Amino acid sequence: MNAEKSPVNHNVDHEEIAKFEAVASRWWDLEGEFKPLHRINPLRLSYIAERAGGLFGKKVLDVGCGGGILAESMAREGATVTGLDMGFEPLQVAKLHALESGIQVDYVQETVEEHAAKHAGQYDVVTCMEMLEHVPDPQSVVRACAQLVKPGGDVFFSTLNRNGKSWLMAVVGAEYILRMVPKGTHDVKKFIKPAELLGWVDQTSLKERHITGLHYNPITNTFKLGPGVDVNYMLHTQNK
């Protein structure tokens, strides 16, 4: 388990990295800024594991892993997991938590494009959760994910749709009213319509397999997966 540094390439938003660096120490605080990620992680994990036909014994890459919430949970399922992130502090938190938990995860500080140049076609599963809306060129990330997965392997994306409802729910509601995430976490201009993401996927070797929405009910304070991709959504693709 290590956290290696590497040269920064063009597809990095330093302001976005700084946001997460500032709160990295609270990544594993179940009642802190990352509480929503902890709450939705079981849903993400079950969706990924089910759609990929299980994770045990598979080589998995988590792109934009942050403090390692999803990466650790996939490792617990028996996967060999590598976590990528450009934030040094989140990776240090992830490394320490994995050590404390007795979980083996290889954490690397580099962009997915850099990783793809060295590890093309090496992964059974690639996950990229809530990361595309935080980089200058999300299409480049999609291309790199396609390069990294083996033939027949699975790639999963999750992001936010760009429309009035997603602005109300993810920005006004989540940041200012419910205060579920820190103010300034999201920029609606960077949200990605499903048609845009699918268009980028179509320009790679990936093929769409399934898409689902991730929904929050403020009355019951619960999350669920289901039809409707007007706010948060997850996309399962497979390498042809």
Swiss-Prot record:
Query: What does the UniProt keyword field contain?
Result: Methyltransferase, S-adenosyl-L-methionine, Transferase, Ubiquinone biosynthesis
Biological processes, Gene Ontology terms: methylation
Q: Which residues form a coiled coil?
A: none
First-level EC class: transferase
InterPro entries (UniProt xref): SAM-dependent_MTases_sf (IPR029063), UbiG_MeTrfase (IPR010233)
What's its catalytic activity?
A: a 3-demethylubiquinol + S-adenosyl-L-methionine = a ubiquinol + S-adenosyl-L-homocysteine + H(+); a 3-(all-trans-polyprenyl)benzene-1,2-diol + S-adenosyl-L-methionine = a 2-methoxy-6-(all-trans-polyprenyl)phenol + S-adenosyl-L-homocysteine + H(+)
Q: Key word Nucleus present in the record?
A: no
Q: Where does S-adenosyl-L-methionine bind?
A: R44, G64, D85, M129
Which pathway does the database say it acts in?
Cofactor biosynthesis; ubiquinone biosynthesis
Give the GO molecular function terms: 2-polyprenyl-6-hydroxyphenol methylase activity; 3-demethylubiquinol 3-O-methyltransferase activity; polyprenyldihydroxybenzoate methyltransferase activity
Recorded E.C. number(s)? Answer: 2.1.1.222, 2.1.1.64
Q: Known SUPFAM superfamilies for this protein?
A: S-adenosyl-L-methionine-dependent methyltransferases
Family membership, please give it. Belongs to the methyltransferase superfamily. UbiG/COQ3 family.
Name the job this protein performs. O-methyltransferase that catalyzes the 2 O-methylation steps in the ubiquinone biosynthetic pathway.
Q: What is this protein called?
A: Ubiquinone biosynthesis O-methyltransferase
Organism source for this protein? Escherichia coli O157:H7
